[in-house]
Amino acid sequence: MVSDGEFTRTQIFGTVFEITNRYTDLNPVGMGAFGLVCSAIDKLTGQNVAVKKIMKPFSTSVLAKRTYRELKLLKHLRHENLITLDDIFLSPLEDIYFVTELQGTDLHRLLTSRPLEKQFIQYFTYQILRGLKYVHSAGVIHRDLKPSNILINENCDLKICDFGLARIQDPQMTGYVSTRYYRAPEIMLTWQKYDTEVDLWSVGCILSEMIEGKPLFPGKDHVHQFSIITELLGSPPPDVIETICSENTLRFVQSLPHRDPIPFSERFAQCSHVEPEAIDLLAKMLIFDPKKRISALDALSHPYMEPYHDPTDEPVCEVKFDWSFNDADLPVDTWRVMMYSEILDFHQIIGAGANGTTQEQMAQIQQEGIQAPSSQYQQTNQEQKVE
């Protein structure tokens, strides 16, 4: 461990963690595609926190944009069932660190450790839907809901995390993004048109996994994934097939043998440990046609949610998220300036003041003549794909 003024440098899993002296007792808790997460103690508050290092955020414009998007979303979305950003800073090595509250575990770990009792299944489903109602009201789609992105503490308080892949509500959404098991069929079928309903499909997959203790659609690849979906739901209806934009995908779907759907009451007949209302809600989430899929708002009013549903305590986001930056095709240096500006703004909002390193870096790049973009971003016909 090396101390350098306000920062302490240590190696964890071969990764350099360079954090402010405010945080001590680092211990690794998880590794993702875009960063390493450690638990730590916040000396200022005495609380346990999670510190997420974003790996090489300025190595490419795509990664810089992804990090900027996640930061903007974490600043904007403030809800009891969403992870809360408590601090953010840049290290002397120009790595970015997000500090959030520390949850004891995630749903994936919980599901692999023991079966869930029905009251926990119900309460966790309610909290996911409560958080999603807020997210969708802000004009945001999560796009990557899965058990490992559902954090839970010892009091069974649940928080949705990892908004790095979140996107604007847009009828021309593109690309594969979510983990395959939880991916809505319209993403696989069209690669083009989808909306908030993709998140409800993911919730249905998560609810089923909580009920049975194993993934509902464990596809080995995209073809197998779609095939096992049709084993339960039957062949997609004609109006869904008509929305398929790819000729290759259309030919593949049309080549499949016709399958009749299996009633959910029959498929989950052995799941006597949960209420029939849970299976009914599941059937309303896992529908081929996204237009017929239940919304988060309506799902909260479903009889299965009745023990927890309280319309006066299920808030929406008062201000839509500003996606004006999202189609911008900007160089890394510009994203860097924008990122520094957002970090300074965050510290001004929370009243803590930005750390000196950030202010010095901001002054330095301004001296180098790199200017932040105007409100009119350079537009591109299509956003670069983020994997």
Swiss-Prot record:
Q: Name one Pfam family in it.
A: Pkinase
Q: What activity regulation does UniProt give? A: Activated by tyrosine and threonine phosphorylation.
Q: What is known of its domains?
A: The TXY motif contains the threonine and tyrosine residues whose phosphorylation activates the MAP kinases.
What Gene3D superfamilies would the database entry show? Phosphorylase Kinase, domain 1 (3.30.200.20), Transferase(Phosphotransferase) domain 1 (1.10.510.10)
| Subcellular location, principal | cytoplasm
> What are the record keywords, sorted?
Activator, ATP-binding, Cytoplasm, Kinase, Nucleotide-binding, Nucleus, Phosphoprotein, Serine/threonine-protein kinase, Transcription, Transcription regulation, Transferase
Recorded catalytic reaction(s): these are: L-seryl-[protein] + ATP = O-phospho-L-seryl-[protein] + ADP + H(+); L-threonyl-[protein] + ATP = O-phospho-L-threonyl-[protein] + ADP + H(+)
| Species whose genome carries this gene | Debaryomyces hansenii (strain ATCC 36239 / CBS 767 / BCRC 21394 / JCM 1990 / NBRC 0083 / IGC 2968)
Xref: SMART domains = S_TKc (SM00220)
Protein's name according to its UniProt entry: Mitogen-activated protein kinase HOG1
Q: Per UniProt, where does ATP bind?
A: 29-37, 52
Which EC class does it fall in?
transferase
Q: GO cellular component annotations, sorted alphabetically?
A: chromatin; mitochondrial intermembrane space; nucleus
Residue numbers bearing the Phosphotyrosine modification: 176
- The reply on keyword Phosphoprotein is yes
Q: What is its EC number?
A: 2.7.11.24
Recorded GO terms, molecular function? ATP binding; calmodulin binding; chromatin binding; MAP kinase activity; protein serine kinase activity; RNA polymerase II CTD heptapeptide repeat kinase activity
